[in-house]
Amino acid sequence: MYFAEPVAKLIEHLAKLPGIGPKTAQKLALYLLEIPEEEARALAEAIITARKNTRYCSICFNLTDTDPCAICRNPGRNHRLLMVVEEAKDVAAMERTGSFNGIYHVLHGVLSPIKGIGPEDLKVRELLLRLSREPVEEIIIATNPTVEGEATAMYLASLLKPLNFKVTRIAHGLPVGSDIEYADELTIRKALEGRRVLE
């Protein structure tokens, strides 16, 4: 199907978004062209504002508009309990459950030798530095139940256990090969409750 160049360019950019294929990009582009101009401007402004005003927390590396983030600076959180997650979206998924009152550390990925991602490409060094300064007692490793997620969990456990931390792994109420982000609140809560000590 032929589209004018500006529309084709919009479709091309939308198709670069995760989970958006060419047909969905086309559908979204046509929808965006149909909405009132003020709605389109508001969407564009929201994207620009989010890009401009969002940064990574200097403590946990979660997305935030303040530094440190609201979770890290909250004295009501249990700062002795730290959950390590792959991505910022995993923090959002955990927070949705309302069942975790500790703090987080976002790795920004997982180990993947095939993709050339090693520990130096993740926030592992920052995690170790943080643990030397904070009163953390238990570390919950909440990487996704994928091959890379498991490898990352085992690597972290091998680093952290000699440092005398209690290191646990969330239970696998989560289906193997899936992402935490897509799990419902009950599944995440059960996985959190059933965490186990990593040997």
Swiss-Prot record:
UniProt cross-references to SUPFAM superfamilies, sorted A to Z: Recombination protein RecR
InterPro entries: DNA_Rcmb_RecR, Hlx-hairpin-Hlx_DNA-bd_motif, Rcmb_RecR, Rcmb_RecR_Znf, TOPRIM_dom, TOPRIM_RecR
Single GO biological process annotation from the record: DNA repair
Superkingdom per UniProt: Bacteria
ZnF locations on chain (C4-type): 57-72
Function: May play a role in DNA repair. It seems to be involved in an RecBC-independent recombinational process of DNA repair. It may act with RecF and RecO.
Family stated for the protein in its record: Belongs to the RecR family.
Protein name as it appears in the record: Recombination protein RecR
Organism: Carboxydothermus hydrogenoformans (strain ATCC BAA-161 / DSM 6008 / Z-2901)
